[in-house]
Regions:
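Active-site-proximal or metal-binding-adjacent scaffold patches in catalytic folds
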Residues: 1-115, 124-158
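Extended, alpha-helix-rich binding/interface surfaces that flank or overlap catalytic cores
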Residues: 121
Length: 158
């Protein structure tokens, strides 16, 4: 009988190999423009590899963002609260919260796109699972740094 923990390790190894293979394909490409299909594909891959498929599939929008590469937004009562300003203590418990991720139209490299998407997925995890009142760059956020490093991803504040 196989252990269940090996399955999780295999997903992480598969994620790392898939990221490395795709990174070599886009190695010399400057100015990566993601499509919604690519964004959803990599969301599913990272969700399965790092988050054990815990994150809900949320809408993703690719648009021009001012001063940001990406945002994880909690929309409750049409207030569209971005991460960092998200305070769950102010949200009434009977209101459903709609989450979505916004990504910039163009990234310097493919790796920047993947790192940004994974970064926003950590904020989504903070909002949906940890119920972190602020969901910003705190100890809950940086607790993912080792898992990201093992998968070959970078987790930084910006």
């Amino acid at each position: 009988m196989k252990k269940v923990t090996n399955k999780k390790v295999n997903f992480r190894k598969q994620l790392k190999v898939k990221l490395e293979n795709t990174a070599t394909r886009y190695k010399n490409k400057v100015g990566f423009k993601p499509t919604p299909v690519q964004a959803y594909h990599w969301f599913r891959v990272i969700n399965r590899g790092l988050f054990n498929s815990r994150l809900p599939v949320v809408p993703m929008y690719i648009r021009k963002l001012h001063k940001d590469w990406g945002r994880c937004v909690a929309n409750w009562d049409n207030r569209k609260t971005p991460k960092g300003k998200f305070d769950q203590r102010k949200i009434p418990y009977h209101i459903d919260v709609e989450y979505y991720i916004e990504l910039h139209v163009k990234f310097p490299t493919w790796k920047d796109f993947i790192d940004t998407l994974a970064h926003e997925m950590v904020h989504l995890y903070q909002m949906t699972w940890v119920k972190d009142p602020y969901a910003n760059h705190n100890s809950n956020f940086f607790a993912w740094k080792n898992k990201f490093k093992l998968a070959g991803l970078g987790l930084t504040r910006c």
